[in-house]
């Protein structure tokens, strides 16, 4: 936990003072703070619970070193400190604990070494013992701001037979810059800090009772002349906390308590990455994976049944079953989850746009988004595979149906991406259809000008690409909104390929949300056409191309989402009609 825990005291001579503080160091110790870690200069203590090992950073100080250290320290001067304002002896550099699990160091000293931290702790100390107090002057309180940090403060009294009112005022504060984290840690900090306070008060009470028993002050108080003015009693106004509790190891114990408090408070609350509901692509992929597993289990079960029926011919039956059982690659191809080869000819949509040219790429992208059949004819199988891998990123997973490479033409209802070898004939009515686009790859007679601009890739310069369709997209046609935004991202050279990919993901999510709204509105609620037109206007998708795109993308919705809506979401009008 990135916080500072400090013990503060209101001195009768000097006002609020910081006695002892513990801070967390994630980075290597600063110069001077870690000098006590060298061999022969560190007093090792026994290993504490939780993997924390404490040591006292004791080193020899020459008079010159002590003077230089005091002059550079952000703390108060020696003349402004009394015995009650000082915790560690002069020349004592403090304590340090090493957390082996997290490689974090917990360092304790009287004041933070960093001037900015010293100022923050000093201000919190003054406020906790002056203006920011709870009723009764004992108890917890919360205060702070964004600039100086947020503070959890718990004030308390320690018995002292020689102090004014027979008690001295202290506070334990925890300072953080994260307000929400500190507020959420309130119950934990309150319970643990109250335990530390109770232990201190218990030790001080025993000393107080012993002093009162040995030297009662009642007669002295009765003989003292009355005066309306406050004055110092005949005693030491600067008694240290170690003398009040009669505990020489007090600061070492406080260090272990504060270090454990910081570690435990940081461990009890952890940040978790909260992901939203799964996307439609994720749901579709999960459904296809479940179908593959179910089909694979059915093949295994049928094979086991054959072996039981004919044990004598089990070997032959197994051979026939293996021959008839589709392989995993065929499963993936059939469900549109085909994986491309390692060799990638087309690197990205931007790369393909450079190779095909802007007009041809726009025509191809328009047909892809509309759900029309895209046919690639080439002898290079890797080229066709890489083209489909790039083009499929424009569509939701549920809308992709790929046959990577076939020896015969397949109908559009079976696939919207079809790879063919050049000799395979395509029916005439398909070539003339406005719902089909064909990309023919020929060997170039001369160097193709487009790949020349593609950085270090010259593998496509030997090809010529001819994009044809029965209904070419007019140059002045507006096209779907997502296509225009996609082309704007592809033409923006200030955007890297990775940024363009993320932009495309955001665009698909935006339009899939519109598809979900339209599906519920039309299929579940069964609203009239007039209301549907108003909805499309609100969605910004009233144009013809946008409507076609939404209807095609609606086929890519997962079965899980559709069944959920159909079973749980019903409109009031539909419920009344059923009743």
Swiss-Prot record:
GO terms for molecular function: enzyme binding; enzyme inhibitor activity; GTPase activator activity; protein-containing complex binding. Residues 493-558 form the dDENN FLCN/SMCR8-type domain. Residues 287-310 form a coiled coil. Expressed in kidney. The record marks 164 as: Essential for GTPase activation (GAP) activity. The keyword Cytoplasm applies. GTPase-activating activity is inhibited in the folliculin complex (LFC), which stabilizes the GDP-bound state of RagA/RRAGA (or RagB/RRAGB), because Arg-164 is located far from the RagC/RRAGC or RagD/RRAGD nucleotide pocket. Disassembly of the LFC complex upon amino acid restimulation liberates the GTPase-activating activity. Residues 86-242 form the uDENN FLCN/SMCR8-type domain. Residues 339-491 form the cDENN FLCN/SMCR8-type domain. The keyword Cytoplasm applies. It is linked to Defects in Flcn may be involved in renal cell carcinoma. Multi-functional protein, involved in both the cellular response to amino acid availability and in the regulation of glycolysis. GTPase-activating protein that plays a key role in the cellular response to amino acid availability through regulation of the non-canonical mTORC1 signaling cascade controlling the MiT/TFE factors TFEB and TFE3. Activates mTORC1 by acting as a GTPase-activating protein: specifically stimulates GTP hydrolysis by RagC/RRAGC or RagD/RRAGD, promoting the conversion to the GDP-bound state of RagC/RRAGC or RagD/RRAGD, and thereby activating the kinase activity of mTORC1. Interacts (via C-terminus) with FNIP1 or FNIP2 (via C-terminus). Component of the lysosomal folliculin complex (LFC), composed of FLCN, FNIP1 (or FNIP2), RagA/RRAGA or RagB/RRAGB GDP-bound, RagC/RRAGC or RagD/RRAGD GTP-bound, and Ragulator. Interaction with FNIP1 or FNIP2 mediates indirect interaction with the PRKAA1, PRKAB1 and PRKAG1 subunits of 5'-AMP-activated protein kinase (AMPK). Interacts with HSP90AA1 in the presence of FNIP1. Interacts with HSP70, STUB1, CDC37, AHSA1, CCT2, STIP1, PTGES3 and PPP5C. This is Folliculin. It comes from Rattus norvegicus. The gene is Flcn.
């Amino acid at each position: 936990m990135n916080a500072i825990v400090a013990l503060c005291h209101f001195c009768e001579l000097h006002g609020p003072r910081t006695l002892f503080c513990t801070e967390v160091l994630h980075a290597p110790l600063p110069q001077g703070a870690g000098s006590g870690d060298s061999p022969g200069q560190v007093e090792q203590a026994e290993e504490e619970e939780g993997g924390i090992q404490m040591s006292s950073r004791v080193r020899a100080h020459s008079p010159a070193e002590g003077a230089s250290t005091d002059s550079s320290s952000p703390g108060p001067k020696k003349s402004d400190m009394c015995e009650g304002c000082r915790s560690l002896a002069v020349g004592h550099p403090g304590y340090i604990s090493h957390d082996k699990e997290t490689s974090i160091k917990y360092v304790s000293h009287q004041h933070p070494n960093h001037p900015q931290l010293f100022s923050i702790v000093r201000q919190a100390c003054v406020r906790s013992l002056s203006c920011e107090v709870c009723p009764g002057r004992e108890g917890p309180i919360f205060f702070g701001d964004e600039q100086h940090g947020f503070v959890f403060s718990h004030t308390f009294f320690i018995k002292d037979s020689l102090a004014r009112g027979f008690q001295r005022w202290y506070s334990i504060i925890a300072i953080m810059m994260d307000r929400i984290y500190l507020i959420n840690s309130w119950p934990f900090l309150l319970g643990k800090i109250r335990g530390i306070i109770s232990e201190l008060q218990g030790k001080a009470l025993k000393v107080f009772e012993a002093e009162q028993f040995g030297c009662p002050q009642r007669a002295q108080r009765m003989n003292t002349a009355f005066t309306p003015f406050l004055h110092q009693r005949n005693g030491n106004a600067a008694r240290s906390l170690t003398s009040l509790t009669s505990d020489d190891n007090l600061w070492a114990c406080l260090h272990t308590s504060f270090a454990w408090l910081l570690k435990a408070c940081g461990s009890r609350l952890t940040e978790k990455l909260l992901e939203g509901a799964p996307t439609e692509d994720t749901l579709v992929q999960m459904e296809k994976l479940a179908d593959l597993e179910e089909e694979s289990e059915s093949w295994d079960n049928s094979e086991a049944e054959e072996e039981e029926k004919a044990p004598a011919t089990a070997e032959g039956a197994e051979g026939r079953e293996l021959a008839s059982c589709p392989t995993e690659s065929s499963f993936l191809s059939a469900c549109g989850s085909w994986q491309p080869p390692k060799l990638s000819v087309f690197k990205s949509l931007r790369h393909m746009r450079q190779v095909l040219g802007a007009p041809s790429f726009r025509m191809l992208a328009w047909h892809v988004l509309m759900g029309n059949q895209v046919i690639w004819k080439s002898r290079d199988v890797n080229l066709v595979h890489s083209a489909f891998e790039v083009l499929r990123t424009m569509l939701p997973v549920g809308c992709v149906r790929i046959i990577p490479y076939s020896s015969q033409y397949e109908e559009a209802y079976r696939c919207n991406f079809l790879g063919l070898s050049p000799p395979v004939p395509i029916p005439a009515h398909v070539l003339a259809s406005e719902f089909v686009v064909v990309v023919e790859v020929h060997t170039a007679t001369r160097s193709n000008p487009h790949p020349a601009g593609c950085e270090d890739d010259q593998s496509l310069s030997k090809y010529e690409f001819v994009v044809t369709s029965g209904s070419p997209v007019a140059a002045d046609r507006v096209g779907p909104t997502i296509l225009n935004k996609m082309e704007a991202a592809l033409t923006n050279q200030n955007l890297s390929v990775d940024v363009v990919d993320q932009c495309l993901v955001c665009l698909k999510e935006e339009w899939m949300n519109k598809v979900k709204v339209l599906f519920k509105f039309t299929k579940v609620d069964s609203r009239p056409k007039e209301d549907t037109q108003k909805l499309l206007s609100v969605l910004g998708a009233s144009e013809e191309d946008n409507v076609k795109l939404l209807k095609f993308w609606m086929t890519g919705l997962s079965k899980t989402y559709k069944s959920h809506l159909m079973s749980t979401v019903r409109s009031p009008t539909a419920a009344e009609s059923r009743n």
